[in-house]
Structure formats: C-alpha cells, structure tokens
C-alpha cells in the first residue's frame, strides 16, 4: 500500500530531481515564464509558490532558505524585492499553468508555466543584454 503517494519521480534519481527543480525554479523566477512538460509543470508549481511565500516573509532565515533552494543570490534578490512586492496582497496562486499542445519529437504534453501578472519584458532579458553587449564590443572594435 502506497499511503500518501508523494511527488512524481519523473524517471530520475532524487538528486537529479532536486537539481532539475532548482534550475527550473531559477529559470521561472528569472524569465517569469517557461515551457516544459506538463508533469514537470505540475511538480514545479508548489516549489515556486513556497519560494514566493518565503519572499513575502522577507526575514533573514527565509532569504537563506530561498538561497539554499535556488542557489542564485541575484534571483533571490529579485524574489524578495520585485516578486514579493508584486504579490503582497495575493494569498497564494502566484503561478499559472496553461497546456500548450504536444512536443513534436515524442508527443509529450507541454505546458507554459508563468507568473500571474508577470512582467512581459523579463522574458529574454538576459539574451537581449548579451546581444547588446556583443554589438557594443563589435562597434568598439570596428
């Protein structure tokens, strides 16, 4: 008997699952929208919701717990400053999961995971900054 059936194993070891969810949570906080498979999306939602709640709590212990979960100080700063302020009046339900069809290669169900009331400009921000830096370097070299 499997009492209290827990999370999905997703055909990975426990350490691989933990690392994958940490990376997915970091990507979601950075870009505010990611595309992944539906089972992964359903598993990442409670993780990120708890991180946002930590951000709303705002104390030092909560910050250290968030750092141990996503391992990126800049993203923790965004979580505690930007996202906590954005969702200060909302009690849960910070994440939206929308089905997005099926993947071409293996027909896996896809889903878009995004923050409710997300910042549209956050997606691809790092790529735009990198491209602008490369173009500035090329202009200086020429």
Curated annotation (Swiss-Prot):
Keywords on this record?
Ribonucleoprotein, Ribosomal protein
Family the UniProt entry places it in: Belongs to the bacterial ribosomal protein bL17 family.
What InterPro entries does this protein map onto?
A: Ribosomal_bL17, Ribosomal_bL17_CS, Ribosomal_bL17_sf
Entry-linked PROSITE patterns: RIBOSOMAL_L17
Biological process (GO) annotations? Answer: translation
Q: Which GO terms describe its cellular component?
A: cytosolic large ribosomal subunit
MF terms in GO: structural constituent of ribosome
For this protein, the record's NCBIfam families field holds:
L17
* Complex formation: Part of the 50S ribosomal subunit. Contacts protein L32.
Is Ribonucleoprotein a UniProt keyword of this protein?
yes
What would be the name of the gene that encodes this protein? rplQ
Q: Can you say what this protein is called?
A: Large ribosomal subunit protein bL17
Lineage, top ranks: Bacteria, Pseudomonadati, Pseudomonadota, Alphaproteobacteria, Hyphomicrobiales
């Amino acid at each position: 008997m499997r009492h209290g059936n827990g999370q999905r194993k997703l055909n990975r070891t426990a350490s691989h699952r933990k690392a994958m969810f940490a990376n997915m949570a970091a990507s979601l906080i950075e870009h505010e929208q990611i595309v992944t498979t539906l089972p992964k999306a359903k598993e990442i939602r409670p993780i990120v919701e708890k991180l946002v709640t930590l951000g709303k709590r705002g104390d030092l212990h909560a910050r250290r717990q968030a750092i141990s979960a996503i391992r990126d100080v800049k993203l923790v700063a965004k979580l505690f400053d930007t996202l906590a302020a954005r969702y200060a009046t909302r009690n849960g339900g910070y994440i939206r999961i929308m089905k997005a069809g099926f993947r071409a290669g293996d027909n896996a169900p896809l889903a878009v995971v995004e923050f409710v009331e997300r910042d549209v400009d956050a997606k691809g921000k790092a790529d735009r900054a990198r491209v602008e830096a490369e173009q500035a370097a090329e202009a200086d070299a020429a």
